Each structure stands twice: as C-alpha cells, then as structure tokens.
C-alpha cells in the first residue's frame, strides 16, 4: 500500500496544522527518481509551488493527515 506522505502522486491531498496541499505534478530526473513535488491549495486559486521531495517528506512527517489519495 502506497503512503502519500512518502510517495506522492498527482491528486493526493494532505493537511497539517490547518494547511492543505494538493499534489498537482511530480518532477523526475533522467533515472525516474522523484525530485520535486508541485502543489497548491485544492479550493483557492493561489499560485502553484514547487518543493524538493525531501522538504515534502519533512512537511508530511508523522502528523500530516491524508485527506484524499490520487490514482497511483
């Protein structure tokens, strides 16, 4: 079973401390390794943001709640 906190895919929605993020895209390097996560807020029209996979995993560490899982 995939954990969206560690292995995000487009469509995943996570929340932590009142902040909600929806994964919109995943950037990979030439070898296929995930390097960056592009995310935004699921209901407001705010600019998309890009985070490294390590900062994404640090943000979701332990206390982030999965609201919705995207199709893997």
Positions of the model-derived regions?
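Basic/aromatic-rich interaction segments and small domains that mediate binding to polyanionic partners
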Residues: 20-51
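Intrinsically disordered, low-complexity, charged/polar segments
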Residues: 43-72
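Short coil-to-beta-strand transition motifs
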Residues: 12-22
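Mixed-charge, Lys/Arg-rich low-complexity intrinsically disordered regions
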Residues: 1-9
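Short structural boundary motif marking the start of a folded domain
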Residues: 8-12, 35
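A generic structural signal for short, solvent-exposed coil/turn residues
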Residues: 6, 15, 29-31
């Amino acid at each position: 079973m995939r954990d969206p906190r560690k292995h995000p895919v487009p469509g995943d929605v996570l929340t932590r401390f009142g902040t909600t993020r929806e994964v919109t895209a995943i950037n990979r390097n030439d070898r296929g390794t995930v390097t960056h996560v592009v995310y935004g807020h699921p209901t407001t029209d705010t600019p998309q943001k890009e985070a490294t996979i390590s900062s994404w995993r640090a943000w979701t560490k332990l206390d982030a709640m999965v609201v919705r899982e995207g199709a893997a």
